Swiss-Prot record:
Superkingdom, taxonomy of origin: Eukaryota
Protein name: Protein FAM163A
Family statement drawn from the similarity comment of this UniProt entry: Belongs to the FAM163 family.
Organism annotation: Homo sapiens
Membrane spanning stretches: 6-26
Membrane topology: Single-pass membrane protein
Keywords: Membrane, Transmembrane, Transmembrane helix
Keyword Endoplasmic reticulum: no
The keyword Cell division is assigned to this record: no
Cellular location(s): Membrane
Length: 167
């Protein structure tokens, strides 16, 4: 490979990686804005739901569960034939069958994750430490043992060329 081919291949690879990152970020933002409801939208939807559809006693539904489309006659009909079996919503537990909350790319808000999104600090101390810190180690005094060779150092190695080599 020539240097130009390597540069072009690296540029294409970097472009593909950046496009993948941008696509994942756009998907996350899309999921965030599609499932987020403001207070006025919730009130308007509740009024419409009272007039049009029966309410579910299980709790609020997510956008994936309550989404509607035009049917052949021009009226709104729910996209799913059966409602969620679990309550949906940002603060409540979510149904995994019809909502994108189970996606690994979904951005969870602070009220959806344990520990409040990291706002509360948790301390950790091992149970074997006492309040004074780690226990002191009691070591025996080192002993010296005489090192003896059965002969001189030259006798232990029979081939002197195997020990040192030219560089």
């Amino acid at each position: 490979m020539t240097a130009g081919t390597v540069v072009i291949t690296g540029g294409i690879l970097a472009t593909v990686i950046l496009l993948c990152i941008i696509a994942v970020l756009c998907y996350c933002r899309l999921q965030y804005y599609c499932c987020k409801k403001s207070g006025t939208e919730v009130a308007d939807e509740e009024e419409e739901r009272e007039h049009d559809l029966p309410t579910h006693p299980r709790g609020p539904t997510c956008n994936a569960c309550s989404s509607q489309a035009l049917d052949g006659r021009g009226s709104l009909a729910p996209l799913t034939s059966e409602p969620c079996s679990q309550p949906c919503g940002v603060a409540a537990s979510h149904c995994t069958t019809c909502s994108p909350y189970s996606s690994p790319f979904y951005i969870r808000t602070a009220d959806m994750v344990p520990n409040g999104g990291g706002g509360e600090r948790l301390s950790f101390a091992p149970t074997y430490y006492k309040e004074g810190g780690p226990p002191s180690l009691k070591l025996a005094a080192p002993q010296s043992y005489p090192v003896t060779w059965p002969g001189s150092g030259r006798e232990a190695f029979t081939n002197p060329r195997a020990i040192s080599t030219d560089v």
